[in-house]
Regions:
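Soluble accessory domains appended to multi-pass membrane transport proteins
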Residues: 27-124
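Small-residue-enriched core segments of transmembrane alpha-helices in multipass membrane transport
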Residues: 2-15
Length: 190
């Protein structure tokens, strides 16, 4: 009987310790406010929109519309990325042009892309970088990197779509082909 009571006491003490840790973490979250209801956060491999914050737990809803209940102690023990607090979003793409593209066309396309991007109203101009990055077996890589003021996810998707259409149109107007990975297979006669 004494052994049973001893084990029960240890289990209760451990449970109380976890509850106390989550409660103290909840107080810290509520006072420090690293995120608020409605913010989109990432904790470890979990991401979602914060729906509720209590002293013991935080509820987030993920992209699959599932509610995840996290003990606040888990939040306090991990890095929290609050995507709702950012000032801008990064857009990066690499265009791979055909290897036989004349250098003059590559240079002109690079300059035209820079001009088009720096005049776009949602592009933060000083962040635009367009460079002839490398020559690979697949083709000539143009690296395009910038930041945009389109913060909301749907707005960002629309921005990306618009930029991708613009880039594709510019490549087509320059009469430059986009490269794609290919392989040559040589058959040997015996």
């Amino acid at each position: 009987l004494a052994t049973g009571l001893g084990i029960s006491s240890v289990v209760i003490a451990l449970a109380a310790q976890d509850i106390a840790k989550s409660f103290l973490a909840g107080i810290s979250i509520i006072s420090d406010r690293p995120f608020e209801i409605g913010d989109y956060i990432t904790v470890g491999d979990l991401s979602g929109t914060v729906e509720d914050i209590t002293f013991r737990t935080t509820r987030i809803r993920n992209a699959d519309d599932q509610v995840i209940v996290l003990p606040n102690s888990v939040l306090s023990d991990n890095n929290i990325i609050n995507s709702s607090k950012r000032d801008c979003r990064r857009f990066r793409i690499v265009l791979t042009l055909e290897l036989d593209t004349p250098l003059k066309k590559v240079t002109q396309l690079t300059e035209n892309i820079k001009l088009a991007l720096t005049t776009h109203p949602q592009v933060i101009n000083e962040t635009v970088k367009v460079f002839f990055e490398t020559i690979s077996a697949d083709g000539i890589d143009l690296s395009i990197d910038l930041k945009t003021s389109a913060l909301e996810y749907v707005d960002y998707l629309k921005f990306k779509e618009e930029i991708n259409y613009t880039l594709l149109d510019m490549v087509n107007q320059a009469k430059i082909g986009l490269a794609y990975p290919s392989q040559s297979i040589y058959l040997k006669k015996d």
